[in-house]
């Protein structure tokens, strides 16, 4: 049989991990639905890994999977399996057995001292794209900056493969997605997903942080996990060593 057109390659994906302290399907479903309501589009059919490390008994994986699917997540595997019996039970439920990965610690938020504001005007962003030390700009490979005049209303979604600049505010229920960085000159109340294609150097800038969700290269925080000192402040958000970093900005 010819193998032309088929190829196996290794890859890395960022996925949400559900840590179980007990295995009550109703409570699992309630928790997931509550989280999904904070960012419906972000969690719509999102892959989910089940961490069973804290469980002392073999759970009913079929019922847990049903609860997860009802909450509109997709269970893809389990991690933290400590016995052959639990491993077999997971396999019988058609769940992959995953080794423990490097998880993002959403509680370990690094707070930096205030620094000079590094907001960029749209023209400055275009200049950065066109020139970098030791290189010559190739106009054919440039990704233009998307500039949105005014506010982004609830229910709107803005996407760009390049940087996104919002000259107004982003309302609750609105979503900004960029493969690069996101600049919001007003208040960020909705969702901002930078580095959507895995760009760990992408950043999020906003004049007033009240976001429902912020995400960089798949690493995310919901509104209830944002560090209190930065809520309502002018901030720069970046990713360093798999941790989301918040920097205060000054005018």
Swiss-Prot record:
SUPFAM superfamilies in UniProt: Cell-division inhibitor MinC, C-terminal domain
Pfam family, one: MinC_C
Classification via Gene3D superfamilies: 2.160.20.70, 3.30.70.260
InterPro entries per the UniProt record, alphabetical: CAP/MinC_C, MinC, MinC_C_sf, MinC_N, Septum_form_inhib_MinC_C
Family annotation (PANTHER family): SEPTUM SITE-DETERMINING PROTEIN MINC
Coiled coil: none
Protein name: Probable septum site-determining protein MinC
BP terms from Gene Ontology: cell morphogenesis; division septum assembly; regulation of cell division; regulation of cell septum assembly
Quaternary structure and partners: Interacts with MinD and FtsZ.
Source organism of this protein record: Tolumonas auensis (strain DSM 9187 / NBRC 110442 / TA 4)
Region (Disordered): 119-143
Family: Belongs to the MinC family.
């Amino acid at each position: 049989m010819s193998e032309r057109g088929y190829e196996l390659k290794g890859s890395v994906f960022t996925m949400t991990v559900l840590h179980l302290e007990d295995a009550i399907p109703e409570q699992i479903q309630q928790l997931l639905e509550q989280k999904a309501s904070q960012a419906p589009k972000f969690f719509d059919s999102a892959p989910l890994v089940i961490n069973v490390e804290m469980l002392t008994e073999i759970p009913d994986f079929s019922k847990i999977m049903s609860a997860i699917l009802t909450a509109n997540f997709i269970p893809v595997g389990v991690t933290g399996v400590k016995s052959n019996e639990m491993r077999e039970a997971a396999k019988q439920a058609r769940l992959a057995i995953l080794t423990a990965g490097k998880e993002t610690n959403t509680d370990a938020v690094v707070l930096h001292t205030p620094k000079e504001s590094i907001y960029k005007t749209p023209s400055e962003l275009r200049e950065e794209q066109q020139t970098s030390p030791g290189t010559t700009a190739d106009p054919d490979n440039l990704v233009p900056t998307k500039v949105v005049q005014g506010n982004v209303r609830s229910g709107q979604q803005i996407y760009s493969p390049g940087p996104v600049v919002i000259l107004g505010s982003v309302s609750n229920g609105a979503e900004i997605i960029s493969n690069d960085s996101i600049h919001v000159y007003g208040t960020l109340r909705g969702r901002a997903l930078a580095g959507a294609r895995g760009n760990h150097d992408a950043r999020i800038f906003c004049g007033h942080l009240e976001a429902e969700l912020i995400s960089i290269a798949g690493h995310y925080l919901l509104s209830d996990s944002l560090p209190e000192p930065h809520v309502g402040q002018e901030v720069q958000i970046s990713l360093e060593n798999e941790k989301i970093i918040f920097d205060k900005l000054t005018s």
